[in-house]
């Protein structure tokens, strides 16, 4: 049972819409990207999220921001029952992957929570009005394919010529509660991660009905 269902939830500075903090100024839905039905972001969903900075502005990415990001990701993990096996913070956008662990996990709520509390750390910059998402299909969730998705994310700094190797970039990692030093570039990471994931995942996490993704 999550914190929200226990009645221990405390409100964020703004109310939540699906994946969007309602205190964001632009709420004209004609400007929003279409999303899959909500159930695709609930339960055992696996989603690659990309949060871009408005006008691709830079100058906010620091060790202090990174620490704040990790702290808020831990709170999101506790609230919504998610693991983040990989994230990478870039100078003008953020990548993260969330994997649901419980039937009541809701990544839409998690993303609204994260954006609401993280955006003040960007000041004076702001996020674009909506995060982009890619819900992984079944074939993308198979272990070898999934690790390939995460590797692609970690390669972003190399592709952008910000680092020669992924491990030279200081703003990437994983957020698995209780394991602060776990990092997806460690040699033994994936066997350890899958063991932790299997232990944390509720047996009913996948008992949610969704039409197939085309």
Residue positions per predicted region:
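Short catalytic/metal-binding and nucleic-acid-binding patches
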Residues: 1-214
């Amino acid at each position: 049972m999550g914190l929200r269902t226990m009645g221990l939830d405390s409100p964020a500075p703004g109310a939540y819409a699906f994946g969007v903090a309602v205190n964001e100024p632009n709420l004209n839905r004609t400007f929003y990207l279409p999303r899959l039905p909500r159930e695709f972001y609930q339960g055992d969903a696996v989603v690659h999220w990309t949060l871009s900075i408005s006008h691709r502005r830079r100058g906010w990415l620091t060790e202090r921001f990174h620490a704040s990001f990790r702290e808020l990701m831990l709170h999101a993990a506790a609230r919504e029952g998610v693991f983040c096996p990989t994230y990478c913070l870039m100078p003008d956008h953020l990548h993260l992957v969330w994997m649901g662990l419980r039937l009541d996990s809701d990544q839409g709520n998690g993303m609204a929570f994260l954006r609401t509390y993280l955006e003040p750390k960007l000041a004076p910059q702001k996020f674009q009005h909506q995060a982009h998402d890619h819900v992984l299909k079944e074939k993308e969730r198979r272990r070898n394919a999934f690790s390939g998705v995460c590797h692609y994310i970690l390669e972003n700094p190399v592709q952008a010529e910000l680092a020669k190797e992924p491990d030279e970039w200081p703003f990437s990692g994983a957020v698995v509660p209780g394991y602060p030093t776990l990092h997806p570039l460690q040699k033994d990471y994936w066997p350890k991660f899958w063991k932790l994931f299997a232990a944390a995942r509720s047996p009913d996490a996948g008992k949610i009905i969704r039409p197939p993704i085309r």
